Amino acid sequence: MTYKMKKEYAFWATVCLLLSLVPEFLNALSEEADDTDSELGSMKPLHTFCAMKADDGPCKAMIRSYFFNMYTHQCEEFIYGGCEGNENRFDTLEECKKTCIPGYEKTAVKAASGAERPDFCFLEEDPGLCRGYMKRYLYNNQTKQCERFVYGGCLGNRNNFETLDECKKICENPVHSPSPVNEVQMSDYVTDGNTVTDRSTVNNIVVPQSPKVPRRRDYRGRPWCLQPADSGLCKASERRFYYNSATGKCHRFNYTGCGGNNNNFTTRRRCLRSCKTGLIKNKSKGVVKIQRRKAPFVKVVYESIN
């Protein structure tokens, strides 16, 4: 009996001790919450998922993405692995701001007349080191226009835009946008390889013009076929083929095994099948002499009238 009373007394003593500690525990939680609120600031994001931490996921890709940082109240860049993760992940900085920052108003960044473009607009096309296939846009300083290119999925440079509209707003000057030019098609010419003749002026006479120099816009195929041969970054030596848009042929080169670009084929046949179809090519092998069509001969018969 005495043992049972002692056990009961110990139980109630423990309960009383725990109850006495509850107020202190609640005060500690309140102080911690106050510290967290002061650290995060008074701004609340528009959506609860904006408060999640950046999650790159379990995969190993390197995709530039953006997340909202609750501590800095800003959208920041991070590298996404390519799978899983959470909803606090955006493809563009502007999308992140519009989704998570209260009161953010979209401001169209336009290059005013005479205004300087950002330095990264003048960077060369850089598809990066990965072998993905992502449609992106870059500003071409030679044509003064935004053009489509294929991004590999990692690294590269800042002259890389998700949409054509975004590229134009940041890098393209609307005042100096070139007016459409009537491009001369190869079908308007006949050639023997050295002499180019205007088809419209041919009338039993071949009028020589200056030779037509191959230009980049004469190619209408896959964009990676215009990339130069890139042997990559590793130390292997594998026989590969790349398409030369200037000659219209596939040439052999040594590939080191990693990196490089998409203008990389295991066989010459695959190279030609993938890239040759985009070349605007003149199929005639000699000077075509065009004669004016003569009127049909009509025989007139005169009969005497008696």
Swiss-Prot record:
GO molecular function (one): serine-type endopeptidase inhibitor activity
CDD domains: Kunitz_TFPI1_1-like, Kunitz_TFPI1_2-like, Kunitz_TFPI1_TFPI2_3-like
Gene3D superfamilies assigned: Pancreatic trypsin inhibitor Kunitz domain
GO biological process, one term: cellular response to steroid hormone stimulus
Glycan attachment residues as annotated in the record: 141, 254, 264, 282
Main location: secreted
Record localization: Secreted
The keyword Repeat is annotated on this UniProt entry: yes
Top-level taxonomic group: Eukaryota
Any one Gene Ontology cellular component term annotated for this protein: caveola
Recorded domain comment: This inhibitor contains three inhibitory domains. The first domain interacts with VIIa and TF, the second one with Xa.
Descriptive protein name: Tissue factor pathway inhibitor
Native source organism of the sequence: Mus musculus
